[in-house]
Amino acid sequence: MDKRVSYCFPNNDTTSNPDAAAYVCIHSNAGGGRGTSYIALGTDYEQKFIGSDFVEKSNEMGNIINQKVAAATGLSQNSPINTPYLILFNKCPVPIAYMEIGFYDSSDLSILQSSSDEIGKAIAEGVDEYLKNN
């Protein structure tokens, strides 16, 4: 289990029930791109002890947050980055949104530097909307 996933549990005790409702990982990139996106898992993703709707719920939350961040910042809203497996998702007990917000080696950098409050608020609003709907 990824150490970060243990934060979903009281006192990091993974033998307990999780006390988090959602997990959001925030990442920025480099490599010539622009905009905001999220990692989306494929529908064939399966984990022992994880609910059958984990992929659907995680992808839904990522999509909502992605829309909110793009609207709040003017960053272009990119399609999800599809992957069949990502270690951070491994054994996560709650829906997870792995966000890719902006690129440090493009004009996105000025938005990341000047709009961090807006980005944080958009992420919070996205999680809130997701939780209200689920």
Q: What do these predicted regions represent?
A:
Residues M1-N134:
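Active-site-proximal helix/loop segments of hydrolytic enzymes
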